[in-house]
Structure formats: C-alpha cells, structure tokens
Amino acid sequence: MGIGVAVATWVCAKLDDMKTVTDETFFAEVPLFSEFEGVTDAANYRPLPDGWVLALADIVGSTPAIAAGRYKDVNMAGASVISAVLNSVGKGDYPFVFGGDGALIALPGSLEKAARDALAAVQVWVEEDLGLTLRIAIVPVADTRAEGLDVRVARYSASPYVTYAMFWGGGTSWAERQMKLGRYGIDRAAPGTRPDLTGLSCRWSPIDARHGEVVSIIAVPGEGRPGQEFRDLVNGIVSITTEQNRDSHPVPADGPNLAFSLHGINREAKATAPAGRRLRQKLIIFLQLAITVVCYKLGIPLGRFDARRYKRDVAGNSDFRKFDDGLKMTIDVDAEHLKRIETLLEAARAKGIARYGLHRQASALMTCFVPTPISRDHMHFIDGAAGGYAVAASRMTGKVLATAPHQT
C-alpha cells in the first residue's frame, strides 16, 4: 500500500512538472505566421491551456484626460500594465495585447498571485503619479469557456526579433465586459506601492503622417461570433493597406526621427525611479539620448549597441496592427485608400457584419518596452496621438469623446 502511494505521488509530481514546462513554453510553441492576413486563419490559433488566467486593465473615464490632450499619459498607463506584469513574472514569453487605454496579458494560473500584486501596484502608481484611474481584474479562462466562448491565441511575427499575440474566440471581449461591470476585481494595494516598470519608455516625439492622416480603426463582429463575412472584411481592409508603402505603417522604415519629448522623458523618469532619484534618472536618460544621437550621426556602434540598427528595429518591432476579438490598426493612409476602407466598413455595418469606430489624427504615438537596448527584442506600442483607439472605440459604442488636441 505504501509503495503504491509513493508511486502515485511520484507520477503526480512528474505530471505537475510537465504541466509547468508546458505552461512556460506554451506561447513559444505556437506556430509563427508572418503575413498579417493570417489573423483570420483559424489554423493559426491555439486554445490557451486550462487553468490559465487573463490579467486585464483599462482607464476609467478617459474622456477628461483625452480632452485635455493627455493621451500620452493614457498610453503610458496602458503600457505600464504590460511592463509591470511581465517584470513580475520574470519577463517570460506570455501572450499580451496593448489596447491604447488598457492591456491584457494571459498567464498560467501558477502566476496569478504575481499578476495580482503587479496589477494592484500599477493601479496605485497610475492614480498617484499620472492622476488617472485604472480598473483591474483577473479572469479565469475557464469562466470564458463556461459561457460557451474561448480564448485562442496566435503568434504573429512582426519582425525576426519580436512576436505579438493575436486573440480570437470571444473570451477576451467577455472578460473585458466583466471587468467593466465590476466583477473579478482585485484588492487595492497600499498607498505608495510601486510596480517594477523597468524598460518602460516614452521618449519619442509624435510621429507625423507622411501619406495623409494617421487613422486608428477598430472593427468587431456585429452579432455573435465572427463568420466568413467578417473574415472577408478584415482581409479586404488589410489588402487595401498593403497597396501603400510598407502596409501603411505609421513609422518610417528607418525608424522615427531623432526627436524626443521632454514631457515623455519626465514621465519615464517618474515611472522608472523613486521620487528622490528622478533628477538622476533624467540625467541618465539625456546621456543615453546624446550617445544615441552621436552614434547615429557618426554611424559607429558603441560596443554591442548600434544606433542605426536600433532605429530600424523600432519600426520593424512596432505593433501598429493587431487582432483581439476584432481588428485594431493605426495606419498612415491617404484619402483615396481611407475612403475605400470606410466604404467596406460602412457596408459591413449596414449588413450587421461588423461594428466599427475610426478616428483621424495628424500623428502617431509610440510607447516602448525595452528590456535592454542591446537586445533586438524591444517592443513598441503604436496608437494615434489625439485619442487613437479610445476615441475610435467611443464612436463604435455611440459615446461622444471630445476631440483631443495634438500632443507632444
């Protein structure tokens, strides 16, 4: 009897070990696709493992902040969620999506406690340092499946160095709705609690449109789950964007101009250093920028850091288009191509195939997560500079947000 119990215990332990390895390597083992049209191919998606959770956050009542031109702060709050959670779990390779005024990260259940603590900490930081209110939640994937939905993930290769998660199945949208209803909440952290925001950066100035306007677009299925007609809509929009240079990418191929935002540098210093060390952090940032500019102008690397290569990688590693139970993209598009996109969207809306929101602005914003500038896997989150996805979403739901002024 004792031997049988021992054997059973050993087998269970081995199975637990195997499960841990599977959880840790799950996303890395999802097959890559490199043509964005693949977001509509169900064969590219894999269901999240049982026992996983969704860590979610978004800004509550972003209207006043957008009207005041503080969308860079809103974007930074959204990106800080990704930075805080990934740093709390050792920067593992887990699926996430940036939504402009919020974010979602999928994690194994074994990391739920770390994610809860990180979300609670970033909520306090956003409130105390940015003056914004962040709503947070942890939703079990099993609960989405109990509703007849699913959370399936695909892995899109934006460049040879960075992949981004695409989500399909209705589960993430359901989880977001539950969060906004006040369910699956997380206890508040103590005042003064600070998350680990190492790598969070927002130094770049807004990136002006070169072809016409920077347009943020959201399109989601009209009723029920997306069918072939919705897939055709997404493919049609993507096809139009590919007719322009670099698929209507809002960031130039050789990277953004070497223009930096003083306001953004101040934000970054507040995010990555405690109150007593922020002046020192600003000086470090200015020194890093000076070195980057000199190395770029002279075309010489500094050790393993190559400024010209880094700037090109910024463009290649940017997430200007994504799929999260619907299409989201921020593109640089001319009037003729935009008109064709709007025609497709309006026809789909009239037929009940899709709901959509669209917002035009003069430039794009970029908020970054750079674990180390030496490595080439730095990530850059793109949104419109004057309200972006938040304003597009408001137009989809029928709410009215004030037009945001140009932000620096």
Where are these regions (language model features)?
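Regulatory and interdomain segments flanking nucleotide-handling catalytic cores
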Residues: 2-408
